[in-house]
Amino acid sequence: MARPLTHPHIDEVTVAGILHALSDPVRLGIVSKLLKAPAGMNGRETTLKLKLAMPKSTCSQHYRILREAGLIVSERRGVDLTSRVRAAELDTRFPGLLASILKSYKKEASRPAR
């Protein structure tokens, strides 16, 4: 039997935890893609759309860090994991934080490589 997924209550989510989780460009990309994704998109689909060439265990590790930081909520559906960003909850707790981080990420991503 699979272990239950744990999610922090929104009151337990910290700015430091969010910044740590989003300090990795892969996780930042996952959050960005999840926000654009249709409802119910699972982790495997997100990984394919991001074109990430990484082992399933590495992908699971990224999702775990995002979940434990309180950025996403995940639910098991068979062998798949469906995740969504807690955007509304996070914006209520930390107004504008996630939007500001993602705006900066998109700006950096659009710059030509040096």
Cite the ranges covered by each PLM segment.
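N-terminal helix-turn-helix DNA-binding core of bacterial DNA-binding proteins
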Residues: 17-55, 77-92
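Conserved acidic functional residues
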Residues: 24, 62, 95
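Canonical helix-turn-helix DNA-binding module
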Residues: 44-72
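Amphipathic alpha-helical dimerization/coiled-coil segments
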Residues: 2-14, 32-37, 82-114
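Generic macromolecular interface patches on structured domains
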Residues: 40-41, 69, 100
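Short C-terminal domain-edge/linker segments immediately following a structured domain
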Residues: 61-64, 73-76, 103-106, 112-114
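N-proximal short alpha-helices
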Residues: 3-4, 32, 39, 63, ...
